[in-house]
Curated annotation (Swiss-Prot):
SUPFAM superfamilies: L21p-like. GO terms for cellular component: cytoplasm; ribonucleoprotein complex; ribosome. Belongs to the bacterial ribosomal protein bL21 family. One of its GO terms (molecular function) is structural constituent of ribosome. Disulfide bonds: none annotated. The keyword Ligase does not apply. Part of the 50S ribosomal subunit. Contacts protein L20. This is Large ribosomal subunit protein bL21. This protein binds to 23S rRNA in the presence of protein L20. The keyword Ribonucleoprotein applies.
Length: 102
């Protein structure tokens, strides 16, 4: 059984005991969070069901930062060069349970 969850503007296909890296959530390590924006999930026969009442329960494993990406701007022949870096804050979750409320 899997579910498709949307958080941080991205969609993730998750099963129980999966570990996912998502955009930063305001939760401390060890805390349980509930992801309520479930787009689709599968039932016992692996049929895709679209439901409004399903939730996914996960626990926070780690609060970390992603790898650095480099932003480099340049204008040719003008001696204009700008280099900048960015590291996005991430939350690592372990999916505990997929709750189907039907």
């Amino acid at each position: 059984m899997f579910a498709v969850v949307e958080t941080g503007g991205k969609q993730y296909k998750v099963k129980e005991q999966d570990v996912i890296r998502i955009e930063k959530l305001n939760a401390s390590v060890g805390e349980e969070v509930t992801l309520s924006n479930v787009i689709a999930l599968t039932d016992v026969n692996n049929n895709i069901v679209f439901t409004q009442s399903a939730t996914v329960t996960a626990s926070v494993l780690e609060q970390c930062r992603n790898d650095k990406i480099i932003i480099f701007k340049k204008k040719r022949r003008k001696n204009y060069r700008r280099k900048n870096g960015h590291r996005q804050y991430m939350t690592v979750l372990r999916v505990i349970k997929i709750n189907n409320m039907e």
